[in-house]
């Protein structure tokens, strides 16, 4: 019976991808280099240096709604980045993104701190389908001032939706989304992500960890 359970478990593990949030969190918990690659790709930069990452970070409230972040990363500038993987469209609603952003903000200042010292925050939803249906790799959400020709408000709160269905391998986001949807590490393009997937799926230590 134990052997049958083990076989069933291994079959389930074989099917998991980084697009599955629990597997994503397990693969990238406290992993600097792969998270740095993901953030630089999504933010279209090459200079983000991640200082620390943590998976399944819970923001609790005794009387109000709490949230749990798939991956929370902090970079060298102190910016806080929340990476969420959402396969169901319901889980990536625009008001949920707003709530995530506000819950992160409330943890960033101590009593007496100046509001202007708030660091920039990024809430990133990687969705399995194209959330907004325009075929774009990324959708950037920013507050703007309507009466000033949509000039940027510049409050430092950034929300980005990543189209998990975008698979153009000529585009950095397309390559990342290809890897996020791979079940086999050998098919993945980025060695940093492939290494983490390979460890969890193909080594005894990784399988035990899962």
Locate each region found by the language model.
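Mixed-charge intrinsically disordered linker/loop segments at interdomain junctions
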Residues: 90-196, 200
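Conserved catalytic cores of phosphodiester-cleaving nucleases, focusing on short active-site segments
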Residues: 39, 69-73, 81-87, 124
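Active-site metal-binding core of divalent-cation-utilizing nuclease and nuclease-like domains
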Residues: 52-76
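Short, mixed charged/polar active-site loops
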Residues: 66, 78-80, 92
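Acidic-basic catalytic patches of nuclease active cores, encompassing PD-(D/E)XK
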Residues: 17-52
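Short acidic/polar alpha-helix capping motifs at helix-coil junctions
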Residues: 2-4, 32-37, 44-46, 74-76, ...
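Short, charged alpha-helical interaction segments and adjacent helix-coil junctions
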Residues: 1-16, 22, 74-77, 81-86, ...
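Extended, gly/pro-poor, charged amphipathic helical "stalk/hinge" elements that serve as dimerization
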Residues: 15, 26, 56-57, 94-95
